[in-house]
């Protein structure tokens, strides 16, 4: 980028060619080599593929070839890849002799060529057949490996004892093992038939060939094992379908990663037992540190970036038909959830816009269909919620609401078995049960004793017992029959007894099983009929709708060869014997590794594991278990999977099992053991972190030499929004005065920070505002105060402006605590608000009336009188702790601490254990070396004890506050003052160095008993306190915070200080494993609320270097010295350098020393270590001094031109350092704060809002059913809307137009953004004087008398022409009505009507269009470039701009232009018209294809009246994409042009005739003018216009992609009549602006102008005065293709108006003709007001109109005036009155006005304006963005 910027700066100088000469010299030689080595003509789509493969091809070859891509790859393989591998004498096999001679000439190591004729086609390739095998140690096999099996390769090595290394080229598509469709169809295609793969290179069928289907198996093996030989197989390179394979002997097979011995064919697999978790962790850690242990052999291949779609429910789909491009999937996923309304046809329309792109040619139609079908799942959303601040009870309720089914499932076994186990535990009832014996002298039941003794005589169930003697029974019968038994008493008699539980259950054998079944039925019902749990829904949503990137990869396997097979089909003769005649036996087939398994979903059962080849030995997998069950297999194999993996999950497919061969042993053979069980995966000790974030803040040395982009403004970050983001308080008509805090306008004794919101003084009585719907705050206050809600609302309207009571926030969210403060002021009360984050006070602090209100943040947020039932849980909300609240309230010099909240940090056992282990082993810290202690355990013993405690410790949470900021911002001082307050007395300080500890002690001056609180980081671990402050946290080992939390059980609050930009800790021991932990910078980044981006230390010059706010009054300096100044402070790069300087008498420390501040300037030594400095250390070195910096030493290292240290070089040359580029992973994410916090807002808002999208559930359920649409679909058809997303916040009236009627292919082109442009603050100009013009003297010409002789009698057919033997029809007269003269007035000028004149467009093509000679794009010539540059300089001269200045791009303004452009495109045509033109968004319509059609018009002007046949104006119909993409660019340019345009240059775009007249009166003078109207202006603009337009866009930093699109379109336009050259097309975006700018640039190139007034409108122009011509004009005129029509006159005509210093007047000659035409064709009623308005512009000038118009046109002016006086109503003739309009009539008109434009509003008198504003329901009616968009003007941007 630095070189590019330098070259761009030299564009306009003569040094550019000399500067670019080295670039050209460096390009010439590679380009020559490329054209010489790769001369073939390549398709343009192939060049990116070749470059990505590392093949240096220029793409400029011209030699044709049937398959040039393969030829280029083959050439690179032979003459680049193999050329470098032939280091010893080598042999080449299977190569044409001519090709071998070229190869040997390039590298003499290629010494031997061996060819074998194996097929009939080999006769043409090889002149002879070799009789020997390779004799060299290195052999190259050219494009033949796919025809050989591993057994044959083993025989080749056996027959060639000297052969050690075999390099092979293999041509096979890697994706052929799972599909028969190519992933690169533009490079190759293939077809699988049986066991044959038919390969077709680049659709060249003559060059196609067949190869075995088993050939891809060469890409899946890592070694070939035979009883006598072991060969390794390695893939060196891959270039699409071409692979370089290395086969070499002498290397053993790769050992297994498992602890088990490898399984041999004669050894059954040993059973494995699952290890415990500790053993698994131990094994994982051992594997982690044993670097020499081999890893799992994986191989991957480059394929298009794609994702794998999930399987359809209960349906199987091939993997190939579920692969879609990742970019398309992500874009469609976002699109279906971003549109306001989603129709069922919208996904198909979006897919259609992508499916025809050439880069997506590999995607199958089935895949596109599956993608659009899957995308209708847009209504599905993850059912998640984020309740961070809920109470424990609320969280518990939410937890049970989400997981109650899991708990019910866990309790089901107990509930179902408990009734069945009840008979086993038949205990008596735990409490006695009452039993009634008698009542009112009647026996109800007998006593228990008698009941047991006499069962046969008493009622009730018999209880078996021992029978009594017979005489006792007889005695009982006798007494009972004679009524001699005692009579029961009257009162009830009750007996208590404990019965068995089973006796209480009726029919327990039936009831208990039924009860068990009943208890299990809810779980069964929920499992089969209810939806999935929230966790299952969440997991399945992300699993299926967020698929990971698909990768073509698999695990390499070993291939076992039991017996070598002959390499050749015919055996070669022995060296001393004749060649054998008998052929060798046929070798067995090379069994392919099975095809990849298809992924099994939850809806389909798992598939059986495919049977593998009997010769493949798989290494055991230890990282991922196979998802399939093991099964018996007829081979000696280890379990593995050769399946290709997509992201993390395997995708199995069940292929057909290959047929057995005679070499395969039978399945029952004892040598075929079954597959081993799968090995469980090993746990990962160190989790994988984000790869995009480095583990260290140290950048590579190369990064230090980068020149970053421009430094952004230090105020680039927007300030926080105000408390009223939706209300235009400043424009509220019900208030007066400035915006001030509430406590200033209404003084009272408020609670702190409760009345800080802004408001204004109300000056009108209460308005009748509607009662708010979300009024829970009013309800609570009403119940507490006793006042009705209507009284409260009325009282608020008496003190607050209407804009604060009725706005989108109140209507959508509810009332805020600002309203509560106003109520407290009105009723002199105070409110205590209880919220989850704390207790807040509002209102009058001295009031005796105190109300209590509770606030719940929701959703929805709500004010209530009673709190929700909630319990307190420790650490549930860290901000609610006592210490955190005190820290939030602490102020020092009126400033709060720079943080907004505390975070709950949970300690990590892994981090703490890593650090304590390194400390115990002496790798980090020095305490482990201290083995002696005067009393108690030694420090080493304490570390050992702490290490053992960490082993059994559990994670715990503490509150954490992070104070971060730039060097010298003052992080430490406020914390020191905080610790001196009483709530923070129990603290301790942990510092990284002794010097820093001494500084803390010096600043805080502790007493003797508190000195222990200040310690270094190691000794601090052995102390305890409630509060821990860690200074310079990033200079401490990783995991120190976690270890400190676990080492101190009394710790409750941690405050960490540090700057993430100043680097972090690096251990000096090479054995320390602390660096394996993730960086603390990125771990603590989420805890940084505010980054203090200011400095009190560094001087102003250093601060400007970094773009930091400086509070140091010293200007400072950066200088270079030749030697060290005496008594100076010196910073060095290394410790040994510092020691050397100290020995020489200088004060020296290393650069990495932090928290060091020098009052005087210090030096920075530049030496050989400077290039190794990290940006962090460079930042520290530059920010140590309050005065300045000296550089000494090797100053070349910090030179501006060729310095190797970027930061030092920028400092020395007084440049700027872009911290975002220096620290790209840190600085952009820091929440920068530019001033201290001086107020904290405690503002709450209540209300509810439904933000979930509305889903058409009926349509969603019927997607699988046939769809019946009406025969004619109306534009408002909404039955196919699937999802509707609501508006969360915003105006009730959506400023965006409906897009439901747009075609599905056009809807993705609309961004549908919300406009955010503020209201315009422009004011209309008021004339100082209001002169009344003198009434003109009207001549006595009547309209009818002049019209009767205006059109002479003539034959219209004589004006027609013949085109292709067909007469034109521009002067139709048959059946045309007329009354003014002898013929129809329409014959005054030709009529262009394509519907009735088929010759109109063909006859106009020659004059209106210019064509290219061929279909090749137009090439910008050097002449075009020079002329375009000159025109751009002239245009900049006209605007007073610097041609070399480049303005930064403003994305916010550009998005506003997108909104305006979209609005204009949707509102300029009816919905029916847009639907009818749906083909404009057809994806099959090329962007460069333009449809030309004729414009229908009856153009009447001076040139066309009484003229003959004229060519029509052509319009260009472009693709909707062009209009919607380049339209905002032109509107963006218009904004800057309108701001920069000088007042003496007038553009008529968007101006009214009255404004034209006013401008002429202000700027024009004299009586000499130059008018010009070009001939064929659009067709005369060639390539120079394209250059001019591109330079205009580059000046505004328009994205290059849009500039290139514009240039490509202008040079490649193609129409139905042929390709067009560069020309202006009416209908392209920005036609008027570009034409006007081109015209202005030509005028400033033609004349030497100095403030001359100029009027420009497209090709029309008027120049005031007679300026001298430019000296360069004669040369430039020859280069231009324009045809001028220059006229020097005193009455210039501009856009149909005569202009003069007295104003402008409509040309009465053309207006008279138009009135004649509309009178004859009866269209006067429709056009009269328009013509009257045009005429009134000149008429209102009074008698000056005679000076404006030429004298010969005054009769027509009189006739037109006569016509309007006799044909207009009195109300219409007011426009012709020179007197002002009566105010009463204006006020009557205002009462009927619904909306007014800015132009209309500016003409109204003051009283009418006030009335219109008072009646307006909009905050700013006349300048509202919606009104401006309706006018299609950029009025808000005019200022």
Swiss-Prot record:
Residue span, (+)RNA virus helicase ATP-binding domain: 935-1092
Protein name: Non-structural replication polyprotein
Organism: Eggplant mosaic virus
Biased composition (Pro residues): 584-599, 652-670
Positions annotated as active site in the UniProt record: 776, 862
Sequence ranges assigned to domain Alphavirus-like MT in this UniProt record: 58-219
SUPFAM superfamilies: DNA/RNA polymerases, P-loop containing nucleoside triphosphate hydrolases
InterPro entries with a match to the protein in the record: (+)RNA_virus_helicase_core_dom (IPR027351), Alphavirus-like_MT_dom (IPR002588), DNA/RNA_pol_sf (IPR043502), P-loop_NTPase (IPR027417), Peptidase_C21 (IPR008043), RNA-dep_RNA_pol_alsuvir (IPR001788), RNA-dir_pol_PSvirus (IPR007094), TYMV_endopept_dom (IPR043181)
EC number: 2.1.1.-, 3.4.22.-, 3.6.4.-, 2.7.7.48
């Amino acid at each position: 980028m630095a070189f590019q910027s330098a070259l761009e700066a030299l564009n306009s100088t003569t040094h550019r060619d000399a500067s670019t000469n080295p670039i050209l010299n460096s390009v010439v030689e590679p380009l020559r080599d490329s054209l010489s080595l790769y001369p073939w003509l390549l398709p343009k789509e192939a060049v990116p593929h070749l470059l990505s493969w590392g093949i240096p091809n220029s793409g400029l070859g011209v030699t044709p070839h049937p398959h040039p891509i393969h030829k280029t790859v083959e050439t690179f393989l032979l003459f680049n890849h193999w050329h470098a591998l032939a280091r010893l004498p080598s042999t080449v096999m299977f190569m044409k002799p001519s090709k071998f001679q070229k190869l040997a000439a390039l590298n003499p190591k290629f010494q031997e060529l061996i060819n074998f004729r194996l097929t009939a086609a080999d006769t043409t390739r090889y002149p002879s057949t070799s009789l020997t095998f390779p004799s060299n140690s290195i052999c190259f096999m050219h494009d033949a490996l796919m025809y050989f099996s591993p057994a044959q390769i083993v025989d080749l090595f056996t027959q060639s004892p000297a052969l050690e290394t075999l390099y092979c080229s293999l041509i096979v598509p890697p994706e052929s093992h799972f599909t028969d469709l190519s992933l690169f169809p533009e490079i190759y295609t293939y077809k699988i038939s049986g066991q044959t793969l038919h390969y077709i290179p680049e659709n060249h069928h003559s060059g196609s060939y067949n190869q075995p289907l088993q050939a891809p198996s060469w890409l899946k093996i890592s070694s070939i094992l035979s009883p006598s030989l072991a060969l390794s197989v390695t893939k060196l390179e891959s270039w699409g379908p071409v692979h370089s394979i290395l086969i070499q002997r002498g290397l053993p097979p790769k050992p297994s990663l498992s602890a088990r011995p490898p399984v041999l064919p004669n050894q059954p697999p040993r059973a494995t037992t699952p290890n415990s978790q500790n053993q698994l962790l131990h094994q994982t850690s051992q594997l982690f540190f044993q670097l020499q242990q081999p890893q799992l052999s994986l191989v991957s291949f480059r394929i298009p970036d794609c994702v794998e779609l999930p399987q359809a429910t209960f349906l199987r789909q091939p993997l190939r038909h579920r692969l879609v491009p990742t970019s398309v999937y992500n874009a469609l996923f976002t699109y279906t959830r971003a549109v306001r309304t989603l129709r069922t046809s919208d996904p198909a329309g979006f897919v259609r816009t992508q499916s025809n792109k050439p880069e997506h040619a590999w995607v199958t139609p089935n895949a596109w269909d599956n993608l659009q079908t899957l995308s209708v799942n847009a209504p599905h959303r993850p059912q998640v919620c984020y309740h961070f601040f809920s109470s424990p009870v609320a969280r518990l309720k939410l937890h049970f609401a989400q997981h109650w089914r899991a708990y019910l499932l866990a309790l089901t076994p107990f509930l179902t078995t408990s009734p069945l186990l009840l008979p086993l535990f038949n205990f008596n009832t735990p409490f006695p049960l009452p039993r009634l014996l008698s009542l009112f002298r009647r026996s109800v039941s007998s006593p228990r004793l008698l009941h047991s003794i006499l069962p046969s005589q008493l009622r009730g169930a018999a209880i078996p017992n021992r029978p009594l003697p017979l005489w006792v029974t007889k005695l009982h019968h006798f007494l009972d029959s004679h009524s001699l038994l005692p009579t029961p008493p009257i009162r009830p008699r009750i007996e208590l007894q404990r019965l068995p539980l089973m006796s209480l259950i009726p029919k327990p054998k039936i009831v208990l099983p039924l009860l068990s079944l009943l208890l299990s039925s809810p779980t069964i019902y929920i499992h089969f009929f209810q939806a999935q749990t929230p966790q299952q829904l969440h997991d399945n949503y992300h699993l299926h709708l967020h698929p990971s990137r698909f990768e073509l990869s698999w695990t390499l396997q070993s291939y076992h060869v039991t017996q070598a097979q002959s390499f050749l089909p015919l055996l070669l003769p022995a060296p001393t014997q004749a060649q054998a005649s008998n052929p060798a036996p046929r070798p067995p087939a090379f069994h392919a590794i099975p095809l990849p398994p298809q992924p099994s979903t939850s809806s389909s059962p798992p598939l059986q594991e495919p049977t593998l080849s009997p010769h493949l030995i798989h290494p055991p997998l230890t990282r991922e278990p196979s998802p399939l069950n093991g099964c018996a297999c007829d081979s000696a194999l280890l379990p593995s999977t050769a399946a290709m993996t997509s992201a993390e999950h395997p995708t199995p497919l069940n292929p057909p099992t290959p047929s057995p061969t005679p070499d395969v042993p039978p399945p029952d053979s004892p040598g075929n053991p079954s597959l081993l069980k799968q090995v469980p995966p090993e746990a990962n000790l160190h989790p994988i972190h984000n790869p995009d974030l480095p583990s260290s803040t140290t950048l590579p040395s190369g990064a230090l030499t980068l020149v970053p982009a421009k430094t952004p403004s230090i105020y680039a970050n927007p300030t926080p929004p105000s408390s009223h983001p939706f209300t235009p308080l400043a424009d509220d008509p019900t208030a007066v005065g400035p915006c001030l805090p509430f406590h200033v306008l209404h003084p009272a004794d408020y609670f702190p920070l409760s009345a800080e919101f802004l408001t204004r003084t109300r000056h009108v009585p209460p308005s009748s505002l509607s009662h708010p719907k979300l009024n829970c705050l009013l309800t609570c206050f009403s119940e507490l105060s006793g006042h009705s809600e209507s009284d409260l609302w009325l009282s608020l309207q008496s003190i607050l402006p209407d804009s604060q009571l009725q706005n989108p926030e109140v209507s959508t969210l509810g009332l805020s605590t600002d309203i509560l403060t106003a109520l407290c002021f009105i009723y002199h009360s105070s409110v205590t608000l209880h919220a989850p984050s704390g207790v807040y006070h509002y209102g009058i602090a001295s009031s005796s009336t105190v109300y209590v209100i509770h606030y719940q943040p929701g959703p929805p947020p709500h004010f209530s009188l009673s709190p929700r039932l909630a319990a307190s849980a420790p650490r549930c909300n860290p901000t609610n702790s006592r210490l955190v609240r005190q820290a939030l309230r602490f102020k020092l010099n009126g400033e709060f601490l720079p943080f907004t909240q505390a975070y709950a940090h949970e300690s990590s056992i892994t981090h703490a254990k890593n650090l304590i282990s390194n400390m115990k082993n002496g790798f980090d810290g020095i305490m482990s070396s201290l083995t002696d202690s005067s009393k108690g355990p030694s420090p080493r013993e304490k570390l050992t004890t702490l290490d053992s405690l960490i082993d059994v410790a559990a994670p715990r949470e503490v509150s954490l506050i992070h104070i971060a900021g730039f060097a010298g911002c003052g992080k430490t001082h406020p914390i020191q003052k905080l610790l001196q307050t009483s709530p923070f007395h129990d603290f301790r300080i942990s510092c990284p160095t002794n010097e820093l500890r001494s500084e803390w002690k010096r600043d805080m001056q502790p007493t003797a008993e508190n000195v222990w609180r200040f310690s270094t980081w190691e000794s601090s671990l052995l102390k305890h306190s409630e509060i821990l402050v860690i200074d310079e946290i990033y200079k401490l080992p990783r995991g120190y915070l976690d270890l400190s939390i676990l080492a101190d059980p009394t710790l409750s609050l941690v405050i960490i200080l540090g700057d993430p930009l100043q680097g972090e800790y690096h251990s000096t021991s090479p054995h320390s494993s602390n660096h394996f932990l993730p960086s603390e910078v990125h771990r603590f980044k989420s805890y940084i609320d505010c980054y203090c981006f200011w400095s009190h230390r560094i001087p102003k010059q250093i601060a400007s270097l970094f773009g930091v706010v400086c509070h140091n009054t010293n200007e400072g300096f950066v200088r270079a010295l030749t030697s060290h100044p005496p008594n100076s402070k010196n910073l060095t790069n290394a410790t040994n350098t510092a020691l050397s300087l100290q020995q020489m008498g200088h004060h020296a420390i290393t650069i990495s020393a932090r928290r060091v501040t020098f009052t005087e300037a210090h030096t920075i030594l530049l030496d050989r270590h400077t290039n190794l400095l990290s940006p962090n250390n460079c930042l520290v070195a530059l920010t140590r001094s309050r005065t300045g910096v000296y550089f000494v030493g090797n100053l070349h290292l910090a030179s501006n031109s060729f310095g190797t240290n970027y930061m030092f070089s920028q400092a020395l040359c007084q440049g700027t350092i872009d911290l975002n580029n220096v620290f790209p992973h840190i600085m952009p994410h820091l929440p920068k704060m530019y001033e201290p916090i001086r107020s904290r807002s405690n503002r709450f808002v209540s209300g509810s809002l439904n933000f979930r999208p509305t889903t058409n559930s009926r349509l969603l359920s019927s997607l699988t059913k046939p769809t019946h649409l009406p025969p004619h679909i109306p534009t408002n058809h909404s039955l196919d809307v699937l999802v509707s997303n609501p508006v969360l916040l915003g105006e009730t009236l959506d400023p965006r137009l409906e897009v439901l009627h747009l075609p599905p292919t056009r809807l993705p082109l609309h961004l549908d953004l919300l406009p955010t442009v503020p209201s315009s603050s422009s004011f209309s100009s008021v004339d100082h004087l209001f002169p009344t013009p003198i009434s003109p003297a009207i001549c006595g010409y009547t309209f009818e008398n002049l019209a009767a002789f205006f059109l002479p009698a003539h034959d219209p057919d004589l004006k027609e022409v013949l085109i292709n033997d067909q007469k034109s029809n521009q002067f139709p007269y048959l059946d045309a009505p007329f009354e003014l003269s002898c013929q129809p007035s329409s014959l005054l000028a030709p009529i262009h009507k394509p519907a009735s004149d088929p010759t109109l467009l063909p006859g106009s093509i020659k004059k209106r269009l210019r064509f290219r000679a061929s279909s090749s794009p137009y090439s910008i010539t050097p002449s075009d470039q020079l002329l375009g540059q000159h025109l751009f300089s002239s245009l900049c001269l006209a605007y007073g701009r610097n041609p070399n200045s480049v303005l930064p791009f403003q994305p916010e303004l550009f998005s506003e232009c997108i909104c305006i452009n979209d609005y204009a495109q949707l509102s300029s045509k009816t919905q029916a018209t847009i639907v009818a033109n749906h083909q404009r968004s057809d994806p099959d319509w090329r962007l460069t294809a333009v449809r030309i059609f004729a414009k229908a018009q009856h153009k009447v002007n001076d040139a066309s009246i009484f003229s003959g046949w004229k060519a029509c104006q052509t319009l260009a119909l472009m693709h909707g994409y062009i209009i919607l993409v380049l339209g905002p660019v032109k509107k963006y340019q218009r904004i800057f042009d309108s701001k920069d345009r000088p007042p003496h240059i007038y553009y008529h775009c968007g101006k009214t005739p009255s404004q034209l007249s006013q401008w002429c009166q202000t700027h024009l003078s004299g009586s000499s003018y130059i008018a010009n109207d070009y001939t064929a202006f659009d067709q005369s603009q060639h390539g120079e216009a394209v250059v001019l337009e591109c330079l205009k866009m580059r000046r505004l930093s328009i994205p290059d992609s849009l500039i290139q699109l514009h240039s490509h379109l202008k040079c490649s336009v193609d129409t139905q009549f042929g390709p067009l050259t560069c020309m202006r097309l009416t209908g392209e975006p920005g036609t008027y602006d570009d034409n006007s700018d081109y015209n202005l640039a030509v005028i400033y190139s033609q004349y030497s102008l100095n403030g001359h007034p100029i009027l420009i409108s497209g090709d029309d122009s008027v120049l005031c005065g007679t300026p001298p011509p430019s000296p360069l004009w004669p040369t430039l005129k020859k280069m231009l293709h324009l045809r001028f029509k220059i006229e020097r006159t005193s009455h210039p005509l501009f856009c149909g108006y005569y202009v003069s210093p007295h104003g402008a007047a409509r040309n009465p000659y053309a207006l008279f003709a138009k009135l004649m035409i509309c009178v004859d064709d009866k269209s006067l009623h429709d056009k009269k007001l328009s013509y009257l308005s045009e005429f009134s512009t000149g008429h209102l000038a009074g008698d000056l109109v005679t000076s404006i118009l030429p004298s010969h046109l005054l009769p027509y002016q009189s006739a037109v005036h006569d016509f309007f006086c006799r044909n207009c109503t009195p109300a219409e003739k007011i426009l012709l009155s020179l007197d002002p309009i009566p105010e009463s009539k204006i006020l009557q008109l205002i009462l009927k006005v619904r909306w007014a434009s800015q132009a209309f509003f500016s003409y109204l008198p003051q009283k009418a304006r006030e009335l219109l504003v008072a009646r307006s329901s909009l905050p700013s009616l006349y300048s509202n963005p919606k009104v401006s968009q309706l006018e299609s003007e950029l009025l808000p941007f005019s200022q």
